C-alpha cells in the first residue's frame, strides 16, 4: 500500500527498483492498477505485490546495498505500509 506524495521525486525510485528486484530473483505480481476495497476500513490507493523465491531471498534483497541506496527515494516521496508474507 503506497501513496505517492511527490511523483517527480518518486520517479527515481520507480526507475531504479526493478533492476534490484530482478537481480535478487524477485518479480512483480501487481504494480499499480485499480484498487477496489471490498471489506474493512483499509482504503489503499496503490498496491505493489512482489514475489521472491523464499523469505531469505526477500530479506537479502531488502537489506542489499542496491536497495538500501534507493530506499530514501521511496520513503521521502511517498507514504505507505510494507509487510513481508511467507506463503505459497
Predicted regions: what they are:
Residues 1-46, 51-63, 86-88:
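Short S/T/G/P-rich N-terminal loop/turn motif that feeds into the first structured element of a domain
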